[in-house]
């Protein structure tokens, strides 16, 4: 802000020392004391060469300190605390005007240079009042322009009167005037921060009675007259010096009283910056946390989608398993149906083969044991013919009548003999026709009604006519029909008993029952019982007993020699 309000004036750029370090000031005071003592000794005695070299080194150090002090005064407007220290150093230099570095210059030049700084202080205070008045009237006056005008005016005025006899009076005056005017202007602005553009300088308690009734022309004439009488003032510089010292002390007090708490303002600025940075960091942290929350929500959404996807995959797998189970069950059902159809066809084939085996056994039994019984049955018809002849009936008529009766009797006998065989042959034909078809099943009504009743009754009559035991044949026949009924009703159970359980897969399970009775042994037993044992028993035992059939077999085996 100071850089914007107070642009730097064209001044020599020298090295700026640290104003916070108070050690050079103390060294300067000690050097001044040493200089005074050295000057007294120089007047009394002539110094040696070693003392001259030491004196030259001290002179050079004092010159450097003076240059640093002058450059420090030119940059005093950078901070209020530094300006206070600079005023102190200026007053200290005014109180100790003797410099060994000025020993080579004339007394008039040294006195003119000493007067340049107090004159700059006083004119700066006067110019500050003028600036305050102009600002109060709404007219802006630039400090740099005013400094350049005053410096040029003083330099030309003194050059016209005294020439180049005043040395660096103009330079010291310009530096002092510029720095003091900037300090006073900054002090007024700090005292009235809300009226920086219209500043009247009333807060610093300066006495304006000397300028309230003066115009700008009168002020300029006074300034010119003060510049022209500078050499006269040099002659009585003791009074002016004391007056300038008091003015410097007053300006120092005024400067210190008008200096604002800049350190506290800087601390507040630092705290505000820290708070702003902390707020910005908190905002960035909030944004980062928001992004992390959004990322976590995205991850949560992704996990939810994965969970739903896994559920859908699980449902798809369950559906596939259900489809596979349904297909397996369907295949198993189809396989069971196929096995059942195959088993039904096999049972019908068994029945057909069993009927043929039974007929062959019946023919063998009739041929060996029932021929005499058939002759006895037909001889009944001959006896009735002989008994039917009478005396009153002619022989021709009686012979015709007896022949007819014999024929009728024999037809009845042969019909009884072959009726059962005819029924069995018809039954066998139907079985053969049904077994040749595909996907044919034997109904229960057919087994119960046709096989059990009609075939059983007709077969019993046939066996009785042939001279066999019809009741025994009927019992064995009913057992055979019962086995056929069970085989047709429990087809899959019979299939499992003979071939094992129906498996969809090709897995082999070792069953204890299977290890004890192999399936081939079971099939062999079923085949022997249904296809050989029952038909042979039903065909042979009604015509002869088991012992008679044993003797018959032994007779034929031994060639018929022992058969009686």
Swiss-Prot record:
Expression (tissue specificity): Ubiquitous.
Superkingdom of source: Eukaryota
Main localization of the protein described in the UniProt heading: membrane
Bilayer disposition of the protein: Multi-pass membrane protein
Gene ablation phenotype (knockout): Plants are more resistant to pathogens such as P.syringea and P.parasitica and develops spontaneous lesions.
Segments traversing the membrane: 347-367, 411-431, 443-463, 472-492, 526-546
GO BP terms, alphabetized: defense response; leaf senescence; photoperiodism, flowering; response to ethylene; sugar mediated signaling pathway; systemic acquired resistance; trichome morphogenesis
Region feature (Disordered): 1-87
Bias kind Polar residues: ranges: 12-28
Localisation per UniProt entry: Membrane; Nucleus membrane
Effect of residue 535 to S: In hys1-2; early senescence, enhanced chlorosis, hypersensitivity to sugars-mediated growth inhibition, and abnormal trichomes
One Gene Ontology cellular component: nucleus
Compositional bias segments (type: Low complexity): 69-84
Residue ranges, compositional bias (Basic and acidic residues): 29-38
Keywords attached to this entry: Membrane, Nucleus, Transmembrane, Transmembrane helix
Subunit annotation: Interacts with SIM and SMR1.
Function noted in UniProt: May play a role in transcriptional processes. Negatively regulates the senescence and chlorotic lesions induced by biotic (e.g. pathogens) and abiotic (e.g. sugars, darkness) agents, probably by controlling programmed cell death (pcd). Negative regulator of plant programmed cell death (PCD) and effector-triggered immunity (ETI). Promotes cell division and endoreduplication (e.g. in trichomes).
Protein name in UniProt: Protein CPR-5
Organism lineage string: Eukaryota, Viridiplantae, Streptophyta, Embryophyta, Tracheophyta
């Amino acid at each position: 802000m100071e850089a914007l309000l107070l642009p730097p004036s064209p001044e020599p750029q020298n090295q700026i020392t640290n104003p916070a370090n108070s050690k050079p000031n103390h060294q300067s005071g000690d050097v001044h004391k040493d200089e005074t003592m050295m000057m007294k000794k120089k007047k009394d005695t002539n110094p040696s060469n070693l003392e001259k070299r030491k004196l030259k080194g001290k002179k050079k150090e004092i010159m450097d300190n003076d240059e640093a002090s002058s450059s420090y005064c030119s940059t005093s407007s950078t901070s209020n605390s530094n300006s206070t220290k600079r005023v102190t150093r200026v007053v200290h230099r005014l109180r100790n005007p003797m410099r060994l570095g000025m020993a080579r210059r004339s007394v008039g030049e040294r006195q003119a240079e000493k007067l340049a700084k107090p004159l700059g202080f006083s004119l700066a205070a006067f110019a500050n009042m003028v600036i305050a008045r102009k600002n109060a009237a709404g007219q802006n006056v630039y400090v740099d322009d005013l400094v350049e005008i005053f410096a040029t005016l003083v330099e030309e005025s003194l050059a016209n009167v005294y020439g180049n006899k005043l040395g660096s009076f103009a330079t010291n005056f310009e530096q002092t005037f510029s720095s003091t005017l900037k300090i006073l202007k900054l002090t007024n602005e700090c005292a009235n921060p809300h009226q920086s553009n219209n500043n009247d300088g009333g807060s610093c308690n300066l006495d304006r009675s000397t300028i309230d009734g003066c115009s700008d022309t009168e002020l300029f004439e006074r300034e010119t007259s003060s510049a022209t009488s500078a050499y006269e003032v040099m002659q009585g510089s003791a009074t002016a010096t004391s007056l300038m010292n008091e003015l410097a002390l007053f300006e120092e007090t005024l400067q210190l009283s008008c200096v604002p708490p800049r350190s506290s303002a800087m601390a507040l600025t630092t705290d505000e910056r820290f708070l702003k940075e902390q707020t910005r960091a908190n905002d960035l942290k909030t944004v980062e946390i928001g992004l992390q929350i959004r990322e976590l929500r995205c991850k949560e959404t992704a996990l939810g989608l994965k969970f739903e996807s896994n559920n859908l995959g699980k449902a798809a797998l369950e559906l596939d398993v259900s489809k596979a189970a349904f297909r397996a069950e369907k295949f198993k059902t189809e396989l069971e149906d196929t096995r059942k159809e195959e088993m039904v066809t096999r049972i019908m084939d068994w029945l057909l083969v069993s009927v043929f085996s039974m007929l062959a056994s019946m023919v063998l039994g009739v041929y060996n044991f029932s021929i005499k019984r058939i002759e006895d049955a037909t001889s009944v018809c001959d006896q009735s013919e002989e008994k039917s002849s009478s005396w009153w009936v002619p022989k021709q008529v009686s012979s015709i009548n007896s022949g007819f009766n014999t024929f009728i009797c024999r037809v009845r006998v042969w019909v009884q003999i072959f009726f059962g065989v005819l029924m069995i042959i018809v039954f066998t034909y139907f079985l053969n026709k049904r077994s040749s078809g595909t996907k044919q099943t034997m109904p229960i009504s057919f087994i119960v009604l046709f096989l059990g009743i009609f075939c059983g009754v007709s077969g019993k009559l046939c066996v009785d006519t042939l001279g066999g035991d019809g009741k025994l044949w009927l019992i064995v026949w009913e057992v055979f029909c019962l086995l056929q009924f069970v085989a047709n009703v429990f087809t899959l159970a019979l299939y499992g008993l003979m071939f094992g359980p129906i498996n969809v897969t090709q897995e082999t399970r070792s069953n204890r029952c299977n290890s004890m009775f192999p399936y081939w042994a079971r099939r062999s037993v079923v085949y022997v019982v249904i296809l050989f044992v029952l038909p042979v028993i039903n065909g042979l035992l009604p015509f002869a007993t088991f012992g008679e059939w044993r003797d018959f077999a032994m007779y034929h085996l031994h060639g018929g020699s022992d058969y009686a």
